[in-house]
Structure formats: structure tokens, C-alpha cells
């Protein structure tokens, strides 16, 4: 993002996520989000402030082998750019099963309930060539990241829409008593 008067060539280091662009653009435009999101505004980093060195990025996706309607059809020509990917998912569907990934600047964890999970030490293996999932050397870090994935899923999985009218006509102050806010 280039901002008027912003530092030229400023690179935001650390882990960021694509949806951070939304929060950043909202901040720059003076817009308030009208929905729950988990993006972080990167405006301070655009001005040179270091990002959170302990931040993790999370991604989820894929589909299960019992969901063939999600599989892509094989292109007719082997020269097609996606031919190898589509052929692999049709021949070995376990390679595209549902997964959740967590990445920090140091490690990457990919959890698949129906397939091979992965853990990479990005400091030692930045190209992710050696899967060390389950290796005793990384047991503590892997366990901590697995707990962080669970915590992230619980915090972000089921948000309620903004602006819904309470059909019970219960006064808002009574709702706050029933569900006290964190302090």
C-alpha cells in the first residue's frame, strides 16, 4: 500500500495476512467495519513501526474425500497449467483433505484430520523440504502450535451478524448483566 506522504519502499516485516489489507484500507479511508473480523491494521507498520514478532497467520481450506462434488474435472490437455494439480487430487484425494495451517516466522504447522499433517522449522528449512511432524525435537513447539490452532478456531469460528434485532425485546442492559463483558 502506498500512502500520501508515507515512507517510500517501506516493507512490513513479520507475518501478515491478506485480510489485513481490508483493516488497513478501512483505517486509511476512515471507514468503520460493520462486521466482525480478525484482521489487523498495518498503518503503523507503513510508517515504520515494527510489527508483532510473535504474530501467527492462520489458513483453513480443502475438502473431504467424501465430497467429490468439490473435485475439479481433469482438463483435456496435459499441457494445461493446472493438469498436474488436478490429476493429483483425482488420483490421490487424500492430498487435498481439509486442513488448518498456522505459520509464524519460525515454524509452520499444517493439521489434516484425514491425511498427512506437517511441521516445518522455517529457520532451518525455509523451503519446507523436511516434514518433522511428530519428531521429538519439536514436540513442545508442535504442541503449543496445535493448542494455538484450537484456540484460534474457537475464537473465530462462529461470529454473529451485526445489527440483528433482539426478537425477545429484552433491554440491552439486561443482556449485559446476563453476559458480562471482559475487564
Which functions belong to the PLM regions below?
Residues 62-66, 132-183:
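Long, internal low-complexity/basic segments
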Residues 60-134, 171-173, 181-183:
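C-terminal, low-complexity/hydrophilic appendages and adjacent surface loops
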Residues 1-36, 40-54, 59-62, 68:
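Substrate-binding rim/cap in mid-to-C-terminal beta-strand-loop elements of soluble/periplasmic
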Residues 5, 30, 50-54, 107, ...:
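Generic structural signal for secondary-structure transition and capping sites
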Residues 19-26, 30, 43, 120, ...:
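Non-transmembrane alpha-helical segments in soluble domains
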Residues 57, 81-89, 157-165:
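Short secondary-structure transition/capping segments
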